[in-house]
């Protein structure tokens, strides 16, 4: 059964000064899938995510759940679309649990309900033990996990219309929490029929957790396919200038990118 398209962008272009960041991108994302946006530094991954999320405003054609982006009120869309940025500039001395509870602002819930939902996602992202810590005193990875819990809280009451966007969510995390974050994202997609779009640099992490890979290079999509189809020595060489061999994980059976020499 074909999955419904919940987010579509057509002919998306973006230019900063004289630099063409994105060039006529056509892309669609479905419910229940994890899509990794990949590519070298400067390929346009984060810019595409910001354009799709509305963080960068545009008059170009973007649709959420079949409805033009410009037709959505911000408050209504925030119940269905959550964005985890690469970093946060929050400096106010909130307690960690208060940061997570900020995700419930768009929701009409009692304080007890907000607390219960926030605690659920704090447990999932392994930050319960930080609940009464001051946010500014936390490490970068701890802050990132808190904000992940906040975004999951934001989407808790959105029914079957959920889009979760993660911009390099593993960049500040240790090995165990990198895998836990992507495991939670994949579980969120499958169990809640959510569309999950994640910007990553690690091809092997993407191969393990993503259903699709959209690989960009110089502002254009080079390939949009499954990990098995996208990860070839030829594509990796053309995009990254890196000679690679493709193997298989011995127990989990996903493609592994390895150095050719």
Swiss-Prot record:
The keyword Cell inner membrane applies. It is an enzyme of class 7 (translocase). GO terms for molecular function: ATP binding; ATP hydrolysis activity. GO terms for cellular component: plasma membrane. Signal peptide: none annotated. The keyword Glycoprotein does not apply. Keywords: ATP-binding, Cell inner membrane, Cell membrane, Membrane, Nucleotide-binding, Translocase, Transport. ATP binds at residues 39-46. It is a peripheral membrane protein. It is found in: Cell inner membrane. PROSITE patterns: ABC_TRANSPORTER_2, HMUV. Its EC number is 7.6.2.-. The complex is composed of two ATP-binding proteins (HmuV), two transmembrane proteins (HmuU) and a solute-binding protein (HmuT). Belongs to the ABC transporter superfamily. Heme (hemin) importer (TC 3.A.1.14.5) family. Part of the ABC transporter complex HmuTUV involved in hemin import. Responsible for energy coupling to the transport system. This is Hemin import ATP-binding protein HmuV. It comes from Vibrio vulnificus (strain YJ016).
